[in-house]
């Protein structure tokens, strides 16, 4: 696989490597490799949302989301790329975590067109972003290249599917209980 160069435009909150969005300031790093069309990612997000929110609110972890386009072929409109690019627009608007959650709540089934850009914009607005700025970002394709870069970097890091959850570099089962236990263990080990 040829290494892709870092896209010229990265969302606010992007990691220094450009391969994810960092949220929070806690000492334990939790990497979340997700695809917005992945039903198991939705299951993880909905099942672990309270834990993720608590980790952020209590400054226990820095969450690094890696929005991938792993499942682009499972939709007729490259939905994974469009949704991941839109998450970058939401990050610019300071509502990344809220947008991710709302996008998973409204997840379309695999095999179809996915949500339209208008529907994605409505989800962004419900998550609290400015409609005009978000629609402009989405419409001009500002972060359209970014999900392919994120996916390439994830493959180089050994990610073979979504969701992949890593705590301080160690893969764990993608569920709330495993996440809680792994973060607690990482805190003890530090």
Predicted segment positions?
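Extracytoplasmic thiol/disulfide redox context detector
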Residues: 1-75, 151, 185-190
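A structure-centric signal for secondary-structure junctions around beta-strands
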Residues: 18, 27, 83, 161-162
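A mature extracytoplasmic/lumenal domain signature
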Residues: 34, 67-69, 103, 138, ...
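Extracytoplasmic/secreted cell-surface and envelope-processing proteins
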Residues: 41, 73-74, 113, 173-176
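Extracytoplasmic/secreted proteins, especially bacterial periplasmic and envelope-associated proteins
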Residues: 43, 47-51, 81-85, 95-98, ...
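Sec-exported extracytoplasmic/periplasmic mature domains
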Residues: 43-46, 53, 57-60, 88-95, ...
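C-terminal cap of thioredoxin/glutaredoxin-like
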Residues: 51, 125-190
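Structural microenvironment flanking redox-active thiols in thiol-disulfide oxidoreductases
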Residues: 55-89, 96-122
